[in-house]
Amino acid sequence: GFALQSRGTGFTLEEDRVNTYAPGKRPFHTIIPAFITREGEPYVSFGLTGGGMQPQGHVQIVMNIVDFGMNLQEAGDAPRIRHEYLNGADIVRLESGFDYETIRKLMTMGHTIAFGFERFGGYQAIGVQG
């Protein structure tokens, strides 16, 4: 026998899928530190924990900093969205802090919304000032 560690759960046994288990394939993995530059200079180094939340959380943190002008603390404190997609799930999980109008719009768009999920992962960041 052999072990695939927990990331092996990202494989599927359904044929003709991108993540179909096959010899030589690697499972989806999310060990992804992030680095943001500003005008070619180091600006922010950060990372998130949380398995499948990592790539989703990275995008949200970058948007909070770059697009919405938040500082590092605000970017980490802002509520996040987690899309559960493995094993046939299709659920949008929300951290507390989203206003009712945002939740209503997501539901109107047909999303299945869930609350109270604790695995959004931790966030750590180092920023360069000046």
Feature map (PLM): residue ranges:
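Short beta-strand scaffold segments in enzyme catalytic cores
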Residues: P33-F35, G122-Q129
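Intein/HINT protein-splicing elements and their conserved insertion hotspots or analogous self-processing inserts
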Residues: F117, Q129-G130
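Proteins synthesized as precursors that undergo proteolytic processing into mature forms
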Residues: G1-F117
